[in-house]
Curated annotation (Swiss-Prot):
It comes from Mus musculus (Mouse). Residues 24-36 have a biased composition (Polar residues). GO terms for biological process: axon guidance; Cajal-Retzius cell differentiation; cell fate commitment; cell maturation; central nervous system neuron development; dopaminergic neuron differentiation; forebrain development; neurogenesis. This is Neurogenin-2. Residues 112-164 form the bHLH domain. Efficient DNA binding requires dimerization with another bHLH protein.
Length: 263
């Protein structure tokens, strides 16, 4: 029984391979290679007196009697394979086209983002330049046609704002002082010694270089927030001028601060 089933299987495989070889030349490569065992079996099947030969002939007649059934059974499988291949090819082409479209989309998005970033940076620089130009218009510059850089403009604006703040605080301090000493001190801070000497004419000495500072960097050991210093090159007579006068000299003078001292 084992020999019969093996022979039938071999014959069926040969018939299937023959049908496939006639259908497509590519299937000819799938034919099995002959061996010595196969040749011996073929010889036994061809002998007319042997039992295996009779059984092989019957099996061969049965297979030849229904060639359409074997071909019909093999053709649907091959057709299915061709259909799968046809389906795979469009899917591959679609994948390639999708990849190309995706790369183009990514490049387009990157270009759009870069253009938007450039526009934002350009607008920011325009706004910054416009703001600095408006700041230069309100800052006092000497000469007026001097062109300041951005850093110089910001530093000068900082110093100018600080000077205005100190001037306002000095005016408040002058308004709060009711004595003649506060008025004279304010006059010493706001007026130059040369202008005061030219107006009074009490001393013929030349004007000295006074410097009154009220900055955060002033020394901490001073009792007053306002510190006035005299340069070494100035004469000593100017120190006597800035000292407050004796009380009997201004006995009948009203002790009121001058209007120019509070400006």
């Amino acid at each position: 029984m084992f020999v019969k089933s093996e022979t039938l299987e071999l014959k069926e495989e040969e018939e299937v391979l023959m049908l496939l070889g006639s259908a497509s030349p590519a299937s000819a490569t799938l034919t099995p290679m002959s061996s010595s065992a196969d040749e011996e079996e073929d010889e036994e099947l061809r002998r007319p007196g042997s039992a295996r030969g009779q059984r092989g002939a019957e099996a061969e007649q049965g297979v030849q009697g229904s060639p359409a059934s074997g071909a019909g059974g093999c053709r649907p499988g091959r057709l299915l394979g061709l259909m799968h291949e046809c389906k795979r090819r469009p899917s591959r082409s679609r994948a390639v086209s999708r990849g190309a479209k995706t790369a183009e989309t990514v490049q387009r998005i990157k270009k759009t983002r870069r253009l938007k970033a450039n526009n934002r940076e350009r607008n920011r620089m325009h706004n910054l330049n416009a703001a600095l130009d408006a700041l230069r218009e309100v800052l006092p510059t000497f000469p007026e046609d001097a062109k300041l850089t951005k850093i110089e403009t910001l530093r000068f604006a900082h110093n100018y704002i600080w000077a205005l703040t100190e001037t306002l605080r000095l005016a408040d301090h002058c308004a709060g002082a009711g004595g003649l000493q506060g008025a004279l001190f304010t006059e010493a801070v706001l007026l130059s010694p040369g202008a005061a000497l030219g107006a009074s004419g009490d001393s013929p000495s030349p004007p000295s270089s006074w410097s009154c500072t009220n900055s955060p960097a002033s020394s901490s050991n001073s009792t007053s927030p306002y510190s006035c210093t005299l340069s070494p090159a100035s004469p000593g007579s100017d120190v006597d001028y800035w000292q407050p006068p004796p009380p009997e000299k201004h006995r009948y003078a009203p002790h009121l601060p001058l209007a120019r001292d509070c400006i």
